[in-house]
C-alpha cells in the first residue's frame, strides 16, 4: 500500500495529467485535492485526446475510484459537461465521488473575477477569469456555498437570496454590471444538484476507509509549486495550495499517512500569465520551444511563456514538497537544439543567489547564471528505455538530477502513454533517499 502525492514543480502545465494517468494503472484511488476549472490536464490514449479540468485522470481506468476532495472548488456546469463528454465516449463515471464539503463556483464569482482583473489595469495578475479566486475568497469569508448546500434546495434558496442580493450591489455599484436574477440562478443550480447527487459523499471518510484497507491512493494536485498561494511568486499565484501539504488539508489525509511525493517538471520551463520568469526566452528560441511543445493552455488557450530549465526553483520545489523523486516531461522538445542552457543560480544586484527569493520584486531582479551543456540533435520520441536515449540526453537528465538532489523515476518523451521511460515505479518501487550513504547525489543512473 502507498499513499502518493503528485505535484507540479514549476508554474503548472508540467504534464501532471499524463504522469497521474500512467500511475493510475497502479492506483486503486485517485484524488484531486485543490484548485478548480482554472487548471486542465490533457491525456492522450490510443490517439484519442481527453481534456479534463475537474475530474481526476484516473477516470479512464474502469476499476479506479476517483474523488474530488474538499479543497477543490467545483463549477457544476463544467463538471457536468465533463461527465457528459466521458459518458458519450462510453467511459463510465460511476466511480466518481465528490466531496460534500467542497465549495461551489457561482455565476457571480465568474463575473467578479473578470471585472476585477479588468479593473486592475497594469496591475493584473493573469487570472483565468473562471471565478476561482472569488470562490476561495467567499470560503475564507464563510459566505460560500458548499456542495452539501447545493443538495438541499431550501438551504440553497435561503443562502442564495441573501448572497446574490449582496453580490448584486458589488456588480452594479463597483463594476457597472447588470444584476443577477436570483430565482434564475437558484433554479439553475437546483438542476445541477440533481445531476450530481449520486456522486456526492463524505470523501474524507472514503479516503480513510481506503487507507484502512491498504489500497494504493494517488493524490493529484493542480497548477504548480510556484503558483502556491503561500509558497509561490505572490501575488502572481493561484488561490489555493498546490504543494504537497495541500493534499492533507484538501482531502482530510493525515500528514503521517503520506508515503512519498513525486514532482513533475518539464525539461525546460514554462509560465502562463503575469509574473517574473528569470529564464524566459524571447525571439526564435522561445518560439521554437513553444511550437515544438505545443505550449498553449488547456483551460484558456493562452500562449505559454517558455524558457530554460531553472534548477533554483527546482531545488525550492524539492524542499517545499519533500520530494522523493521526479518525473521529467517533454524531453523530446529539446531534440533539435545544438546547445542547452540550465540555470544553476541567480545574480541579484551583483551578488550570487542560490536560493529562490520570496519577494516577487526581488525575484524580478534575478538574472540567471547558466551552465551550457551539449544537445543531442537526435529524435527521442520513440525511445522506450534509458539505453535507447543518446548519451547527451542521458547526461542532461543526470545533470538535472544532480542539481535537484533527487532521483528521476520517469522520463516522458511525448503526449501518449507509451512515449514514456519508467526508470522506477514510484508506487511499488523501493523508496530511495535523496542522497547515497557516501553523500553523493542520487541520480536516475542509480536505478
Swiss-Prot record:
GO molecular function: adenylosuccinate synthase activity; GTP binding; magnesium ion binding
SMART domains noted in UniProt: Adenylsucc_synt
Catalytic activity annotation: IMP + L-aspartate + GTP = N(6)-(1,2-dicarboxyethyl)-AMP + GDP + phosphate + 2 H(+)
Domain of life: Bacteria
Cofactor: Mg(2+)
InterPro entries: Adenylosuccin_syn_GTP-bd (IPR018220), Adenylosuccin_syn_Lys_AS (IPR033128), Adenylosuccinate_synth_dom1 (IPR042109), Adenylosuccinate_synth_dom2 (IPR042110), Adenylosuccinate_synth_dom3 (IPR042111), Adenylosuccinate_synthetase (IPR001114), P-loop_NTPase (IPR027417)
SUPFAM superfamilies: P-loop containing nucleoside triphosphate hydrolases
Residues binding IMP: 13-16, 38-41, 128, 142, 223, 238, 302
Gene3D superfamilies with a match to the protein in the record: Adenylosuccinate Synthetase, subunit A, domain 1 (3.40.440.10), Adenylosuccinate Synthetase, subunit A, domain 2 (1.10.300.10), Adenylosuccinate Synthetase, subunit A, domain 3 (3.90.170.10)
Bound cofactor: record note: Binds 1 Mg(2+) ion per subunit.
Function recorded in the entry: Plays an important role in the de novo pathway of purine nucleotide biosynthesis. Catalyzes the first committed step in the biosynthesis of AMP from IMP.
Complex and partners: Homodimer.
Family of this protein: Belongs to the adenylosuccinate synthetase family.
Protein known as: Adenylosuccinate synthetase
